[in-house]
């Protein structure tokens, strides 16, 4: 009885003395009241058909599997309890339910064990559970999935402290149950909550409902596990939600990290591209600087050539009887003629060309207007004389010059006509003395014949400057020791473009050799000269005219010139 008074004080219920009638009350009156309560519960059940939820039996089955010992204890205790005890407990529960419906919202302590509160809770979560099953398609998959909507309903009521104060609520329930049942039943109920928090509520509600032995008690059994399932589902879903939130939280930093890495990579690529551009720009600027240096104003080649244009004209297609006085008379109307040089052969005959020098280049250009005019019965050909280095050998300038394009290729002169019977040293001395007045001589070459050791009758003289070279050319036809010298510009070796021989004149060889050779050599050849010969002599005054045996007999002699051993092959 003392326990019942404690219960009434804790729940703040005034008529707590109702169960004091105890076991000495009338049995008939208790049975009548039970029947009235059963009929009232049936009416409530009929008025609220949505309270039948499909997942409720499954939850009961799960809890029956999880906690078989509490149910066994409940069944044993219910068997030992009397009908009077169950009736008295039912009356006491009814009184408490009517006056403690409001505290149920604060904490699920005593109303979870009552019948009406279980019915109310059964009616409320029925629809959310059904909706949850339709939405997710998994009505019986797990506690967190089937009871997720139940947790939302309990969240409207302050359900957070339920988890913390479950132990105290269970103790209060134990006290109330002990006053309603025997001492053994209360002991078995007190052992169950120590093992688990939420399932203990379901076990205690089962103990109270089994003792009633009525159909209303079965409905209470369905409602009580639902309340426990709500608590379990709330705790499970809180854990799941916390895990999901914890799982979602690292995803966001990972995405941020990926974005930061991508941004860093893009920034690095941009910086690399900028570095490459910076590295390339100096390379582009460097050639520009060199170009600016190379693009410095320079005097064009044409201007240079014009600045050093010669005042000398080349005359071609001249009459062989033309003299210097006739040339001066021809050009006296154009300007002042300083000198006239007519090229001659070794015998003094004219070669048909010459040079005329004027006082200025303007006068020389003006004299070009007389090109094609008749001079001593022939149309004269006029052209500006090329200064040394002002043209490319073997090429013609824009004026269509017809003079020898190899002229001016060097500052060397070719000399022949001197006494070739003298020794090499004496020939050298005589030539140096004869051309000393022209200018400084840098080299004198007198080729010698290897077989005879005598001079070939030719010599080459190099001068230091162009002026000396030009003066030396004027000495062509001059006398040296009783011999008339022939002076001309030296040609490179192998140049035999001019017919009539390099120095052979009218008696030259067939292919332009200097002394009658086949391809312009100095010492004759197989088909040299007009009178030919195998060697063509040493280049006398008239070229290869004094050649050897001549004719085409040289072919036969050339065939027998070999000195090797003769080999014959017999028919054997």
From Swiss-Prot:
Biased composition (Acidic residues): 82-91, 109-122, 144-156, 177-191, 208-222, 235-247, 261-276
Protein name listed in UniProt: Nucleolin 1
Cited InterPro entries: NUCL_RRM2, Nucleotide-bd_a/b_plait_sf, RBD_domain_sf, RRM_dom
Main location: nucleus
Annotated RRM domain residues: 311-387, 411-492
Subcellular location: Nucleus, Nucleolus
CDD domains in the cross-refs: RRM2_NUCLs
Protein task: Involved in pre-rRNA processing and ribosome assembly.
GO cellular component, one term: nucleolus
Signal peptide region: none
BP terms from Gene Ontology: eukaryotic translation initiation factor 4F complex assembly; formation of translation preinitiation complex; rRNA processing
Biased composition (Low complexity): 7-21, 45-58, 72-81
Stretch list, region Disordered: 1-312, 488-572
Organismal lineage: Eukaryota, Viridiplantae, Streptophyta, Embryophyta, Tracheophyta
Organism: Oryza sativa subsp. japonica
GO molecular function: ribosomal small subunit binding; RNA strand annealing activity; RNA strand-exchange activity
Annotated Pfam families: RRM_1 (PF00076)
Keywords per UniProt: Nucleus, Repeat, RNA-binding, rRNA processing
Transmembrane segments: none
Compositional bias (Polar residues): 300-311, 553-566
Biased amino acid composition, Basic and acidic residues: 27-38, 488-520, 528-545
PANTHER family: EUKARYOTIC TRANSLATION INITIATION FACTOR 4B/4H, EUKARYOTIC TRANSLATION INITIATION FACTOR 4H
């Amino acid at each position: 009885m003392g326990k019942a008074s404690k219960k009434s004080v804790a729940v703040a219920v005034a008529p707590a003395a109702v169960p004091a009638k105890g076991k000495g009350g009338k049995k008939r009156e208790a049975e009548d009241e039970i029947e009235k309560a059963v009929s009232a519960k049936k009416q409530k059940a009929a008025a609220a058909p949505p309270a039948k939820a499909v997942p409720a039996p499954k939850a009961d089955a799960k809890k029956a599997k999880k906690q078989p010992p509490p149910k066994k204890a409940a069944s044993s205790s219910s068997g030992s309890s009397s009908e009077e005890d169950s009736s008295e407990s039912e009356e006491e529960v009814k009184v408490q339910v009517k006056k403690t419906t409001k505290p149920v919202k604060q904490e699920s302590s005593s109303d979870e064990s009552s019948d009406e509160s279980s019915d109310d809770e059964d009616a409320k979560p029925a629809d959310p559970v059904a909706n949850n099953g339709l939405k997710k398609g998994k009505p019986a998959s797990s506690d967190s999935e089937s009871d997720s909507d139940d947790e939302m309903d309990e969240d409207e009521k302050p359900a957070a402290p339920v988890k913390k104060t479950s132990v105290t609520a269970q103790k209060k329930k134990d006290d109330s149950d002990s006053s309603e049942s025997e001492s053994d039943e209360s002991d078995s109920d007190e052992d169950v909550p120590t093992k688990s928090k939420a399932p203990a509520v379901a076990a205690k509600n089962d103990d109270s409902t089994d003792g009633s032995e009525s159909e209303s008690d079965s409905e209470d059994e369905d409602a009580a596990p639902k309340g426990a399932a709500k608590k379990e589902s709330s705790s499970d879903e809180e854990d799941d939600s916390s895990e999901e939130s914890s799982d979602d939280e690292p995803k966001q930093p990972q995405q941020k990290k990926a974005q930061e890495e991508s941004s860093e990579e893009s920034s690095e690529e941009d910086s690399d591209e900028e570095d490459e551009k910076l590295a390339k720009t100096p390379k582009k600027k460097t050639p520009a600087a060199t170009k600016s240096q190379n693009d410095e104003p320079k005097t064009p080649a044409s201007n240079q050539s014009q600045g050093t244009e010669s005042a000398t004209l080349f005359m071609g297609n001249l009459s062989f009887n033309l003299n210097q006085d006739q040339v001066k008379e021809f050009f006296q109307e154009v300007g002042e003629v300083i000198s006239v040089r007519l090229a001659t052969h070794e015998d003094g005959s004219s070669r048909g060309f010459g040079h005329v020098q004027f006082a200025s280049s303007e006068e020389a250009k003006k004299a070009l207007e007389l090109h094609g005019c008749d001079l001593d019965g022939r149309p004269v050909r006029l052209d500006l004389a090329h200064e040394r280095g002002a043209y490319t050998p073997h090429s013609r300038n824009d004026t269509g010059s017809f003079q020898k394009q190899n002229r001016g290729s060097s500052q060397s002169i070719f000399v022949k006509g001197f006494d070739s019977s003298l020794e090499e040293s004496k020939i050298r001395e005589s030539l140096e003395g004869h051309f000393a007045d022209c200018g400084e001589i840098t080299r004198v070459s007198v080729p010698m014949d290897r077989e005879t050791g005598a001079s070939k009758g030719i010599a080459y003289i190099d001068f230091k400057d162009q002026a000396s070279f030009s003066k030396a050319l004027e000495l062509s036809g001059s006398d040296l020791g009783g011999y008339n010298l022939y002076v001309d510009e030296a040609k490179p070796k192998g140049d035999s473009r001019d017919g009539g021989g390099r120095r052979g004149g009218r008696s030259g060889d067939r292919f332009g050799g200097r002394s009658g050779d086949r391809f312009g050599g100095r010492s004759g050849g197989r088909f040299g000269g007009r009178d030919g010969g195998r060697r063509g002599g040493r280049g006398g005054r008239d070229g290869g005219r004094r050649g050897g045996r001549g004719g085409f007999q040289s072919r036969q002699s050339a065939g027998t010139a070999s000195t090797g051993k003769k080999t014959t092959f017999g028919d054997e």
